Amino acid sequence: MVLIGGRTHLLPHEPAALGVALGECLQQDGIELVLDVRAIAARRENSEYVLRLEDGREFRGDRILVATGRRPRTADIGLETVGIEATQGGIPVDTRMRAGERLWAIGDVTGLWQLTHVGKYQGRVAAANILGEPREAHYEAVPRVVYTDPQAAAVGAKSGPFRATAKLSQVAKMATYTRVAAESNGFLTLFSDGQRLTGAVALGPEAGEWIQQATLAIAARIPLPVLGDTIQPFPTFSEVYLEALKSLHQAIQA
């Protein structure tokens, strides 16, 4: 398998360390990475597909999977009849998901976050407002998960005044996972303003599950001392928070 991308590392919208580490994992699994170059043409030759890159290289294979993202479909659905003017990014909405008088929009069509769980969240916000229960949508703690093996996950800010990283191998050797996972390059990085968590990125088995501790901490603005005093179950990957928070405390006190 060959993975071709136009950026210098995978997951270009996340901190570089996450994309680089994921790339190393994929390469260990035998996937060839061809980065910082774009595909410009494709053709069929007999039973093979041929993909040509802008630097002249060609790759042959049985299948080509093109991942180009998606765009909100707002044309020809009658928006003009209800006084709504969509932009290239989608249908503009306010914090209560209102697109206009007695009109609401949720999900990908808003162009805000093209994630299923965000669409569900927006649906709950819209439903509450429709029922006369004022509620606003907030996006400071949106979890983002890439379901590779291992999983890559992130939430909140992508940088901050203070940061600390803990390797998953510090705790995985005691967890109920295989030794292969324990020896992986998985990690947890926390970002902070000095008082609370503002962001986190993680790589490792089921990272989309244990990133949720950071999601809740950011959403609820939980003070760092409270997080540091939280008991983590043994043996689990969640113990990596203890190491990361200890390092974060040292960075803040330095």
Walk through the language-model features, giving the residues of each.
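Rossmann-like dinucleotide-binding cores of NAD(P)H-dependent redox enzymes
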Residues: 1-48, 115-120, 128-160
